[in-house]
Structures are given as structure tokens and as C-alpha cells.
Amino acid sequence: MKNPASSLSNKNKFLVLGCGFSGSWFAKTIRKLGCTALTSSRSEKKDPNSFVFDSESLIIPNKKIFDGVTHILSCIPPDKNGNDPVLRTLRNKLKSLSLEWVGYLSTTGVYGNTKGDWVSEINEPNPFQKRSYKRLNCEKEWIESGLPVQIFR
């Protein structure tokens, strides 16, 4: 079986939106594959591969950040109203790009309390916590966005 990651090259440019633990790990891994990975945070960092994005304060990345972007991973949680902050502030910009792939990092919490049973993508979501309902709503927003999205739970 061919490894899909093997088709990545230094021509690929990733934006990792929300660079906590998972986003940082993803960016580090992508860089090891020879790709460019720029990461967002809510405050300025000394890292030249980092940029500021804060949807609550409406601090939007400079247009130049998006030049040549081929892939996006969003790790940013829902806002207090349960909407996706990336789509709320950047939807039109993202739709104007020639993206090959968009990933949205969700949670297995959308499956609800399975009392230890295994779940997979064939299981129906059944959230019981408010934050899981919000995540499920964001998943739906991404799916309906028309972008080439893949949901990770």
C-alpha cells in the first residue's frame, strides 16, 4: 500500500491553525516530510514560522501568509456560541485558495458516553456534553463549507 504522505513535497505549504499540543506535533511531523508548515497562535511568538490569529479579537493573518497554501489543519475549538471561529472569520479567504486538503481536529466526545465500547466513524454521533455538541456543530460547518475537508475524531 502506498503511503499517501509520500506524495507530499517541499512544494506543499500547510497552515496549522491552533498550535497547541496536537497542532505543534502535526507541524513538526509535516516539516520532517519536507513541507513548509506555518503555525498560528493568539499572541506573537519568536518563531519565524508562526503568525498571529485570534478570531475573538479579530486579529486576522496577513494576506501574504496564505500565498501558496495547499493544506490546512484546524485545531481551534468552537467559540462560546458553538460556531467554528476559523470559518466565521476566514471562510471566504479559504474558499479563494486552491486547497488540496483541509483537516479539522474534532473529538471522540461527539459519540457520547459509550461506557468503554469502541467507536468508529460508522457510529452515529450522540453527544451528551455541551462542548461535544459544539464540536459536532463545527464538524457540520466544515462539511457544508464546500472545502475538501477531512474530519479527525
Set out the residue ranges of the language-model regions.
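Conserved Rossmann-fold NAD(P)-dependent oxidoreductase catalytic core, especially the SDR/UDP-sugar
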Residues: R91-K130
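Short glycine-/acidic-enriched loop or helix-start segments at secondary-structure transitions
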Residues: F26, N49, G82-V86, L90, ...
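Hydrophobic, well-ordered beta-alpha structural blocks that scaffold small-molecule cofactor pockets
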Residues: M1-K63, S74-C75
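NAD(P)-cofactor binding segment of oxidoreductase domains
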Residues: D67-Y104, N137-K140
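Active-site YXXXK catalytic motif of short-chain dehydrogenase/reductase
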Residues: R131-L136
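Conserved beta-loop-beta element that borders a ligand/cofactor-binding pocket
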Residues: K140-R153
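Active-site regions of enzymes building and remodeling cell-envelope glycoconjugates
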Residues: D47-S57, T89, G116-E121, P148
